[in-house]
């Protein structure tokens, strides 16, 4: 969906991250480091609960989120909040991220739903074949990945480690995301009035940790606020919203 001048989108610093102290069991760290030939690759969905075109893309992102070769993140934009329903997960920072991608990818406008694939291309997500084609293109362009190794200690801090990687003089941004794995929201007004909307991997906290020069490095991130039902991801991409060159995720164990 598009709007006069700019389309329906949502932003980054999402509110209400759960309080610290809850018991949380992460997936085994040994399963996390990946062979560089295996990805993962990043899929970022820009969406809004106020847009009636978005629910099918939200469901599709939920299926992509189950794949070990994909880091799937849902960013809720805020520019459709005026049309009858205020998305509880939206923020201006998310909208700013989408607009930055639009500039880099030379889009005339922003729209929802929009899936940005590994920072190299975009589509609505309605045609899954187009998304798979973009994923294939991402794999061809970036067969060797700067895949971060993620481990979380008993002190609640996330260790992020990157091996040396040839950046050819072009720096990269290392960004951290904390996300809720699923939300079901009854929508009382707006275009989706009366519907129960399911959203997946909803980003609640997003920050650029550093600008990286390609030398072996490590960082520590405070994740004491992490709760059951949440996950964390790290995205490494060419500076200023360029192509993604590596990413990884760490999620809680799911029983049953």
Located regions from the model:
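A conserved catalytic-core signature of glycosyltransferases
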Residues: 112
